[in-house]
Amino acid sequence: MARRPFQLANGNGEPIRGDVWIDETGGSDGVIVICHGFKGFKDWGFFPSTAEQLATRTGRPVVTFNFSGSGIGADMENFTELDKFERNTFTQEIDDLAVVLDAAQAGELPALTSRDRFGLLAHSRGGIAAVITAAEDSRVGCLVTWNAVAYANRWSAKQRKEWRRSGRIEILNSRTGQMLPLGLALLEDSERNAQRLDVLKAASRLSVPYLVIHGTDDESVSVADGVRLAEAGPSASTRLELIEGGGHTLGAVHPFQGTTEHLTRAVELTAGWFSENLAD
């Protein structure tokens, strides 16, 4: 299994850093692209292991990447780009994902010839970009979300008022102890582009097979979000898999300490879904 790093630039000139995971045969034509969630990054916990397992089990290349506003710097591990984290928006993440798909289609990613058929796997907030992209971009042929959010604007009226008053809010990163800033751009994006960022409406427009995986004990995103996403998707091509007792990260931690029963189940379901539904 080869892991080939790459760096792209989005429309603002900001770097999108990622990796291509590919076996010695070069894999089939369909490519799986993984989107991390809020405060996540491509090398967090289960992502490298999941990428390697999906590449091995499905025979398809897998791409992992950091959204340009993830806050993770060139060392791939630490939140050293807090200015970008503060400016990040949902729309920017959708645009970043398009940059990755465009590069793969153009043959600009290492070890990959031109590809034009993609499967998306997204965790948590990454599901917003993935579901909307799957609804808008005909190159996407298959979708899986893990513990994804069903709503972009998740803040109360009180929180939004305080956010506007102060110009920013701060979120604790319990792993590092850092306070991570969110600027007004995120709130304004969620309001200005509310129609496009309606995740449930996007799910209802899907024309591709969609697997919703959600842990019943998710402490960050209610299992109700997963149920709503599955209910919104077309009934003939959408499937809901609840992982009994599964938490938000399916029991995985960072640094990665190995798989768990819940994570193993999610990977098995995901690999099967892509193998069955992502055409070459």
Q: Where do the model's predicted regions map?
A:
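Alpha/beta-hydrolase active-site loop
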Residues: D83-L109
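Catalytic active-site module of serine/aspartate enzymes centered on a nucleophile-bearing elbow/loop
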Residues: G246, L250, H254-D280
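Short, surface-exposed "cap/lid" segments of acyl-processing enzymes
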Residues: E24-S68
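N-terminal cap/lid segment of alpha/beta-hydrolase-fold proteins
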Residues: M1-G26
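Primarily recognizes the serine-hydrolase "nucleophile elbow" in alpha/beta-hydrolase
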Residues: V100-R164
